[in-house]
Amino acid sequence: MIHKELENIRRNYKLKSLDTKDVDLNPFAQFNIWFEEMLKSNLIEPTAVILATASKQGKPSARTLLLKSYDETGFVFYSNYESKKGNELAENNNASLLFYWPELERQIRIEGKVEKVTQKESEKYFKTRPFKSKVVHGHQINQRLLTAG
């Protein structure tokens, strides 16, 4: 069934326009300005970002995850290396991030190559995880060990 009324749903965006004279030439500096603005707006899930990956056959896949940090070297998120996204990134490390902040009438798209953080950084992050998350992750590791032999 086609919903014809969807064609008529349209919102007028009036908060801000994107004018090149108002944008910092350094994309990381501009992202930081917008990110700080977003944090002040008290969004429900301020660090939510959509990660889009593709298999080596080019089949796309997208999911929402949480940004853990960013600086001029890149944007950091964590994932199980053996998850679908982990496997896709291992065979094709090209990906994109999409921040969508409808309350601010803004979205930011970032494209690039994904690389693993150091083992030390990964372990440091794992220690900050809630207990239940650590248990689930440990269970996944044990499952892999049991099925690997």
Regions found by a protein language model. Name each.
Residues 1-149:
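Binding-site signature for planar aromatic cofactors or substrates
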